[in-house]
Swiss-Prot record:
<dbReference type="InterPro" id="IPR005845">
    <property type="entry name" value="A-D-PHexomutase_a/b/a-II"/>
</dbReference>
<dbReference type="InterPro" id="IPR016055">
    <property type="entry name" value="A-D-PHexomutase_a/b/a-I/II/III"/>
</dbReference>
<dbReference type="GO" id="GO:0006048">
    <property type="term" value="P:UDP-N-acetylglucosamine biosynthetic process"/>
</dbReference>
<feature type="binding site">
    <location>
        <position position="241"/>
    </location>
    <ligand>
        <name>Mg(2+)</name>
    </ligand>
</feature>
<feature type="binding site">
    <location>
        <position position="245"/>
    </location>
    <ligand>
        <name>Mg(2+)</name>
    </ligand>
</feature>
<dbReference type="GO" id="GO:0008966">
    <property type="term" value="F:phosphoglucosamine mutase activity"/>
</dbReference>
<dbReference type="Pfam" id="PF02878">
    <property type="entry name" value="PGM_PMM_I"/>
</dbReference>
<dbReference type="Pfam" id="PF02880">
    <property type="entry name" value="PGM_PMM_III"/>
</dbReference>
<dbReference type="GO" id="GO:0009252">
    <property type="term" value="P:peptidoglycan biosynthetic process"/>
</dbReference>
<keyword id="KW-0460">Magnesium</keyword>
<dbReference type="GO" id="GO:0004615">
    <property type="term" value="F:phosphomannomutase activity"/>
</dbReference>
<feature type="binding site">
    <location>
        <position position="243"/>
    </location>
    <ligand>
        <name>Mg(2+)</name>
    </ligand>
</feature>
<keyword id="KW-0597">Phosphoprotein</keyword>
<feature type="binding site" description="via phosphate group">
    <location>
        <position position="102"/>
    </location>
    <ligand>
        <name>Mg(2+)</name>
    </ligand>
</feature>
<keyword id="KW-0413">Isomerase</keyword>
<comment type="function">
    <text>Catalyzes the conversion of glucosamine-6-phosphate to glucosamine-1-phosphate.</text>
</comment>
<comment type="similarity">
    <text>Belongs to the phosphohexose mutase family.</text>
</comment>
């Protein structure tokens, strides 16, 4: 794979107004993508965004670039990332574009692309777009310029799609649900989905103003959700991130239920109903208790690198349909082609209704092991993880933890840092083990 200049693991991302998230660059990105994608046929590209104020500027720039390349843009307005994956498929579009920086603050933004199949663009297509960006920009003749249109019923279409994944014979009419939409793209989706399935819904984080996305709310900050669940005596709390591809839950006691526990609940339910195809993909950061709980059920488990892109790649490699991260990206591949917070929450709610069990009862099978994380800074040069002394200490700790825990040592890709992670049933042993390894790293 060629070295990337602009595309990271999740498209092009950065601070608004700083290269490359500038109007002129994004216009050219729209043009370059249009030139590469225009070979497909339908001539239309879907553009969705989250609720950041910069989304207006960036969608206009993309539209101009696409039009110059001869492609038409169809705008959905604020829409979750997984909704764009779904709508791109149903509209038979050349591609889908999402303007979002996910869980980042409002002053960041990004551009990511979906293929006509609703999956991330293949590497060779991203590389072709990067190569096109190096060419001088031109414009098709006037008669071939693209147009712009708006899909007025995009939200309704996606709401119906989400509801179609919930068993028709079940209802949420006995449930009180607090929904936190992070003042992001699910603000007009998730509350309506839950209400239309019968739930009593209490909303927080559903008043976007362009600048309050992810601010003290959503999947990355659940304190307000926990308080509201307890205050209103709700059955469950749901927290999405700014673009709706992550889910974190809160039980009726106010306890956090993370992505590992959510993944287990969905996997066990799929196994019971005979819909689990193969096993489950987690990441290097997935809690060991998830692995052990799945093992007890006879469900295979493999770890991918951190990042939903890598989870999906591993799922495709094994031809499995379920994967996710502890951060709350949950991919149910027979329902959508990317992580989908709303659909993941419906899968858990269906299990609650079906078995008349609380979220707390469903999640109790995965008692998360304490994780201790220590970041150790080192002087540039040799990688301390290659030192014999560090390897010896790591091996000794692994023997002590045998079967009861695990260690993960990683060098940061962006800073001179070694990340030491120790996970163990015994919190004190985890802390002592992590400090022992960190000390060995510092001494080398």
């Amino acid at each position: 794979m060629a070295e990337r200049k602009y595309f990271g693991t999740d498209g092009v991302r950065g601070k608004v107004g700083s290269y490359p998230i500038t109007p002129d660059f994004v216009l050219k990105l729209g043009w370059a993508a249009g030139k590469v994608l225009a070979t497909q046929g339908t001539g239309k590209v879907l553009i969705g965004k989250d609720t950041r104020i910069s989304g207006y500027m960036l969608e206009s720039a993309l539209e101009a670039g696409l039009a110059a390349a001869g492609l038409s843009a169809a705008f959905t307005g604020p829409m979750p990332t997984p909704a764009i994956a779904y709508l791109t498929r149903t509209f038979r579009s050349e591609a889908g574009i999402v303007i979002s920086a996910s869980h980042n603050p409002f002053y960041d933004n990004g551009i990511k692309f979906f293929s006509a199949q609703g999956t991330k663009l293949p590497d060779d297509v991203e590389e072709a777009i990067e190569a096109m960006l190096e060419q001088p920009m031109d414009c098709v003749e006037s008669a071939k310029l693209g147009r712009a249109s708006r899909i007025n019923d995009a939200a309704g279409r996606y709401i119906e799609f989400c509801k179609s994944t919930f068993p028709a014979h079940l209802s949420l009419d006995k449930y009180k649900i607090v929904v936190d939409c992070a003042n992001g793209a699910t603000y007009h989706i998730a509350p309506n989905v839950m209400r239309e399935l019968g739930a009593e819904v209490i909303e927080i984080g559903t008043q976007p103003d362009g600048m309050n996305i992810n601010e003290n709310c959503g999947a990355t900050d659940i304190k307000a959700l926990q308080n509201k669940v307890l205050e209103t005596k709700a059955d469950i709390g749901l927290a999405y991130d700014g673009d709706g591809d992550r889910l974190i839950m809160v039980d009726h006691f106010g306890n956090k239920v993370d992505g590992d526990q959510i993944l287990f609940i969905i996997a066990r339910e799929a196994l019971r109903s005979g819909n689990l195809k193969g096993g489950v993909v987690g990441t290097l950061m997935s809690n060991m208790s998830l692995e052990l709980a799945l093992k007890q059920l006879g469900i295979p488990f493999v770890r991918a690198n951190v990042g939903d892109r890598y989870v999906l790649e591993k799922m495709q490699e094994y031809n499995w349909i379920l994967g996710g991260e502890n951060s709350g990206h949950i991919i149910i591949a027979d329902k959508n082609t990317t992580g989908d917070g709303v659909i993941a929450s419906l899968a858990v709610l269906a299990a609650m209704v079906q078995h008349k069990l609380s979220l707390n009862e469903l999640a109790s099978a995965v008692k998360l092991f304490p994780q201790v994380l220590i970041n150790v800074r080192f002087a540039g040069g040799a990688n301390p993880l290659e030192s014999d002394a560090v390897k010896a200490v790591a091996t000794e700790v692994e023997k002590q933890l045998a079967g009861k825990g695990r260690i993960l040592l990683r060098k940061s890709g962006t800073e001179p840092l070694i990340r030491v992670m120790v996970e163990c049933e015994d919190a004190e042993l985890a802390q002592l083990s992590a400090e022992k390894i960190a000390e060995a790293v510092r001494s080398n």
